[in-house]
Swiss-Prot record:
Membrane topology designation: Multi-pass membrane protein
Effect of D191E: Retains some of the calcium channel activity
Organism: Homo sapiens (Human)
Record protein name field: Calcium load-activated calcium channel
Tissues in which the protein is found: Widely expressed in adult and fetal tissues, with higher levels in thymus, prostate, testis and small intestine and lower levels in brain, placenta, lung and kidney. Present in most tissues in the eye, including the trabecular meshwork and retina (at protein level).
GO biological process: calcium ion transmembrane transport; endoplasmic reticulum calcium ion homeostasis; ER overload response; multi-pass transmembrane protein insertion into ER membrane; ossification
Pfam families xref list: EMC3_TMCO1
Disease tied to this entry: Craniofacial dysmorphism, skeletal anomalies and impaired intellectual development syndrome 1: An autosomal recessive disorder characterized by craniofacial and skeletal anomalies, associated with intellectual disability. Typical craniofacial dysmorphism include brachycephaly, highly arched bushy eyebrows, synophrys, long eyelashes, low-set ears, microdontism of primary teeth, and generalized gingival hyperplasia, whereas Sprengel deformity of scapula, fusion of spine, rib abnormities, pectus excavatum, and pes planus represent skeletal anomalies.
Gene Ontology molecular functions: calcium channel activity; ribosome binding
GO cellular component, one term: multi-pass translocon complex
Keywords, in A-Z order: Calcium, Calcium channel, Calcium transport, Coiled coil, Disease variant, Endoplasmic reticulum, Glaucoma, Golgi apparatus, Intellectual disability, Ion channel, Ion transport, Membrane, Mitochondrion, Phosphoprotein, Transmembrane, Transmembrane helix, Transport
Intramembrane ranges, chain numbering: 172-181
Phosphoserine: residues bearing it: S111, S239
Length: 239
């Protein structure tokens, strides 16, 4: 009798089958009774569904993490900035000056006297100085928030390192791909890394949280302010 060949254990793989299971080797194939083996196409479909469900779960987890970090950032800012008397006073002055300046700009005409134009320019300069002071008050909270974000990002980045957490519906620009495809295998540029999705979610969610909590600057202040709060006022009209 010919000697039986030993099975190559390294070539043996256990496949999950629809309705049961089976064992496959390089020299044999065995399926359990009552089980129907999946075709290679069905196996690829099942694997793809599993990957998509995993990415969806990772995306929801990252959104939840972003919400928590945004709330933490606003909590730190409230403790260090929002509740202080100096911030409240500067914010009230900026709001008052912005509305007053906007109203004057709407009523002034091109034929206005030089004295009126000089008065508006002085108010613009005063508003710019108050905005700068307001930004400096908020600056001390930015260092604490930056430290917390860096620590949390490093911790979660080690958990999601090398994992595709989402599929982008577009191909990112070449200078963004270093961030969107960071530490990912393969050449598919639509694969999204943790750090890219985390930054996008945190930036957008925090702005919405500020609006919901009433901590964002008003439209008038944003329109008239320069620096951190918005574009500089178009003063060329009055020169």
């Amino acid at each position: 009798m010919p000697r039986k060949r030993k099975c190559d254990l390294r070539a043996v793989r256990v496949g999950l089958l629809l309705g049961g299971g089976g064992v496959y080797g390089s020299r044999f194939r065995f399926t359990f009774p009552g089980c129907r083996a999946l075709s290679p196409w069905r196996v690829r479909v099942q694997r793809r569904r599993c990957e998509m469900s995993t990415m969806f779960a990772d995306t929801l987890l990252i959104v939840f993490i972003s919400v928590c970090t945004a709330l933490l950032a606003e909590g730190i800012t409230w403790v260090l900035v929002y509740r202080t008397d100096k911030y409240k006073r500067l914010k009230a002055e900026v709001e008052k000056q912005s509305k007053k300046l906007e109203k004057k700009k709407e009523t002034i005409t091109e034929s206005a006297g030089r004295q009126q134009k000089k008065k508006i320019e002085r108010q613009e300069e005063k508003l710019k100085n108050n905005n700068r002071d307001l930004s400096m008050v908020r600056m001390k909270s930015m260092f604490a928030i930056g430290f917390c974000f860096t620590a949390l990002m490093g911790m979660f980045n080690s958990i999601f390192d090398g994992r595709v957490v989402a599929k982008l519906p577009f191909t990112p620009l070449s200078y963004i791909q270093g961030l969107s495809h960071r530490n990912l295998l393969g050449d598919d540029t639509t694969d999204c890394s943790f750090i890219f999705l985390y930054i996008l979610c945190t930036m957008s969610i925090r702005q919405n949280i500020q609006k919901i909590l009433g901590l964002a600057p008003s439209r008038a202040a944003t329109k008239q302010a320069g620096g951190f709060l918005g574009p500089p006022p178009p003063s060329g009209k009055f020169s």
